Amino acid sequence: MCGESAPDPNRHGERGPVTTISVVIPCYNDATFLEVVLAALAAQTRPADEVIVVDNASTDASARVARAAGAVLVVEPVHGIWPAAATGYDAASGDLIARLDADSVPPPDWIARAEAILTLAPLVDVLTGPGDFYDCPRWVAALGRFVYLGGYFRLIGLWLAQPPIFGSNFVMRRAVWAEVRGLVHRERDDVHDDLDLSLHLPPSVTVWFDPTLRVGISARPCETWRGIARRLDWAYCTLALHGQAGSPWRLRLARRAWARRLRS
C-alpha cells in the first residue's frame, strides 16, 4: 500500500488497540549520533514505553550514552546490522516494535503519528516512511531522496508488489516479528536487514508507506562510491539469497491470491 489516501480502519476488526510501543536502535560506535536520537525520543509528544539500544560491540561511549538516557541496553557481540536489529526486536516487549538507526532524527510527533495510523488501520501490519538527509549539501540530499531512496521504494516496491520496509524508519506489529524471526537471515552482515525482512513477509502481511512519516537520516551511506557499491552488493546478495521464492512473479501471484481470499 502507498500513502496516497488514508488507511481504511474497518477492513479488519480482530486486532485490538495499540497499548505499548518499543523503539529499537542498533548502534555501533555512534555515541554522538545516539545522543541526538535519544534526545529526540525524549521530546516525543507520545513517549515510547521502551527504548532499546543494541550495543553491537562498540568501543566508544555508546553504552554510557544509552544508560544515561534511561534506555534499555542490550549487547549483541556478533557484528552486523541484522544481528543487532534482530536481537533488539527479540528483546522488545511492546505491542508495536519501532525501528530507528542511531543516526535517525525523528520529529516530535513520530511515535504519535505511527500509533494513530496503526490504531485506525488494523489491517496495516507494518508502517514505514522515507528519510530526509540532514548532513549534506542540498543537491546531495535531493539526489539521495529521489535516486537512492526513491529508487529503493519504487523498484523494490514493484519487485515485492507492495512497499518495502525502510530500516531507518518503520513500525511493525509484534506479531509480524514473531512470525518471521526464525526465517530471516539474522546472522548475516552482508545483507540489507530491511530488504531481507520485506522479502520474508508472508502475503497476509500488509506494509503501508506513509510519505508524511518522515525522519532525518545521515547521508553517510552515500558519501563515497565505495559505500554506495557496498550497499549495492548487499542488495544483490539479499535478493540472491531468496532465489526463486523471492522472484517478483511469485510474490505478485501470492499477494493476488491472498487479496482474492480476503474478498471472498
Feature map (PLM): residue ranges:
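Short, acidic, metal-binding catalytic loop of nucleotide-sugar glycosyltransferases
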Residues: 39-48
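Glycine-rich, basic loop-to-helix element that forms the pyrophosphate-binding segment
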Residues: 76-92
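A conserved acidic beta->alpha catalytic loop
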Residues: 55-63, 104
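Short beta-strand-to-loop acidic/aromatic patch adjacent to the donor-nucleotide binding site
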Residues: 94-105
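Acidic helix N-cap motif at the loop->helix transition within catalytic regions
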Residues: 32-35, 60-68
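Acidic donor-binding loop at a coil-to-helix junction in glycosyltransferase catalytic cores
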Residues: 188-197
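Short, flexible, basic/aromatic active-site loop/helix in glycosyltransferases
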Residues: 129-134, 142-163
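Conserved donor NDP-sugar-binding/catalytic core segment of glycosyltransferases
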Residues: 109-140
